[in-house]
Amino acid sequence: VSDAFDLLVLGDGNPDLVLTGAVEPAFGQAERLVEGARLTVGGSGAILAAGAARLGLRVGFCGVVGDDHFGRFLREELERRGVDVGGLVVDETGPTGVTVVLARPNDRAILTHAGTIADLRTELIDPARLERARHVHVSSYFLQERLTPELPALFERVRAHGATTSVDPNWDPAERWDGGLRDLLGQIDVFLPNETEATRIADLPELGEAVLALAERAGIVVAKAGAEGAVAAHGERLVRARPPTVDALDTTGAGDAFDAGYLASMLAGDPAERSLAIANACGALSTRAVGGVDAQPTMDEVLTLLSLGDAGR
């Protein structure tokens, strides 16, 4: 179908205000000056959608924003980055979510007002969009309280017409680490947690062990471990890959750029090892600028970085 999406993202979108420098707040009405402040695309789903579009995929985004400045900002920024936002619903009763990121070079603290983030549900998603997607990704599973109970039926529907599925759970603010997710694993083709999320969801302390346990139920499990790279499991086979070294300014959105790279490579038919290498390169390159989207690479940049790495071996 000429108007099909390679990737349809169902998820969270909200602006991120990223502060850099001496970002530890001091209460007692003390004012501190930080080095930088940037308002940019935030929300795991929106960052992933922008990253996948940058890599050349045809991407649609479905989410909910409020009828306010932050919602309009998100729509305009995603459109500017080549994402189809026809599925971005405006809720006139609630505010768009917003996140403040206190960013250090290799770590960050995140403060989020959820706003409309949790309001996405099946009835707000155009069925024609789902039917026109090669792959459907759900971001921030634990934040999407209204969508998650409906995902088993939704995934059954999209897989019945040949689409593949993926989920990035992201952090569980309640730290319960289930919410129906374990039961959904059997319908997830690619499960994309980070190291902490994988070990908490599997309830196993060691990453390799956790990934293998999750892979007994999900198709492929790919766990991000930051500067250590990533671990993937398919059946009983475990693959590890280290990321290329770059000068990191801000790791915000690196995991989402990683996801975008993995899915783009997988949808191109690449083997798991290559998808892992491309994902690692996308994650690493995305840390070169403040915020989640401004340093997201093109596929040419990724392949150049990987060829330099191969030449240096």
Put a short name on every predicted segment.
Residues H135-L212, E228-A230:
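Conserved beta-alpha-beta core of the PfkB/ribokinase-like small-molecule kinase fold
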Residues G13, Y141, A257:
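Active-site metal-binding loops of divalent metal-dependent hydrolases
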Residues V1-L8, L33, R157, L207-R313:
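Conserved phosphate-binding/catalytic region of the ribokinase-like
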Residues S2, R129-A133, L185-G186, A215:
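A short, aliphatic-rich alpha-helical micro-motif
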